[in-house]
């Protein structure tokens, strides 16, 4: 069996914590004021190795050869983003929809679109929140009758929907739902590489204070740091009776990264959580890498179920009931009460998991999607590889650190949230390497991204560099994207056979 651990080889360092920021209503955006190079692209530009693959994939599925007409493509982007109440993406693709010659009446909502397009909405809803509920019968209903879809069209639609569901997670996690006015962080930044290349006259470095300038990169305007500058890791530690974290125990992962106390602070901000130093984390990774004993299949299964059940018991960072869908997005949303429910339930004796050994991207999904939608598999595969392998091999100034164990724990934990088990993986490593607050943020970003607030970030992260936060959010986006596609493509395969 060809597992992901072999497929995505040479996996390296990734930041230990995640970033969250505030959300605002769709009315905050004037799309005419956005640069041609949109904010999402600029943020992803912190990581050029991934940036190129992301843009190539998005351009292909939106503008390249494919079975769906342009108006369908852009409308699918709108309704996918609306499931997560993401005004930034909805407003952006409403504008693109009109620019592509779309019927403005469709922007009145789901009651104003063709019956054929309306028919795929249930799949949009299921993929966004509970992809394990998708069945081959959903595919069959789409491909039969008066307004039927071809199988190639269904695949194209599923690729689009999963892309924009996952992109919504990224947008909220990176604070791109915020207005640009008055949100500059007190921490100085360097611009993403991709942005710097496009604007060579503008340079903002951590050591060269720069006054706000008209036309400077979006990341110099958007606050991607702790919204409460008076809160620091020392305060967090002392309030819990612990010693202030040593700045030498910082973790870094990015070309502009210097120090990072966030990993320590996340653990120390909860009294019941014991923080670990970077040295301890590195030692754990080393021990896990050297471990020779192999677990039985029964033990591996038991450890997966334990982590999955712990995930079900883990509240999102904002567990209270979700607010209603904003009125300026509600016309794109049907059955708003259909949201994520934990795949695993505490006390269940058997859990119907999605086993990668039975259906994997590498052995099954890639060839199926590429066969039904020419060349898209190549783009998706390159994007997944880039996200999984992205590395600067640094940790708190220490170079040439192999943290593949840590990154694999993050990727597999994200897919565990969706009931996917990598059969060859020891899920005991997840609890060794990922602290509880990090798990909480990952779960929220995947399942309830619209709930992420500055308060959540304040209580979890301290002094992270922009590139580090973006790095983790890329992992969340791509692992989720792949999880949705695995469920979708498996049901298409079942329908075809």
Swiss-Prot record:
Tissue: Highly expressed in muscle-enriched tissues (at protein level).
Entry GO MF terms: amino acid sensor activity; L-leucine binding; oxidoreductase activity, acting on peroxide as acceptor; peroxidase activity; protein-containing complex binding
Reported induction: Up-regulated by reactive oxygen species/ROS generated, for instance, upon chronic TOR signaling activation.
Start-end of Polar residues biased regions: 226-241
Null mutant phenotype: Sesn-null flies do not exhibit developmental abnormalities. However, fat bodies from third-instar larvae contain more lipids and adults also contain more triglycerides. Flies heart function is compromised with arrhythmia and decreased heart rate. Skeletal muscle undergo accelerated age-related degeneration.
Gene3D superfamilies, per the entry: AhpD-like
InterPro entries hit by this protein: AhpD-like, Sestrin
Presence of the UniProt keyword Metal-binding in the record: no
Protein family (similarity comment): Belongs to the sestrin family.
Name assigned to this protein: Sestrin homolog
Organism: Drosophila melanogaster
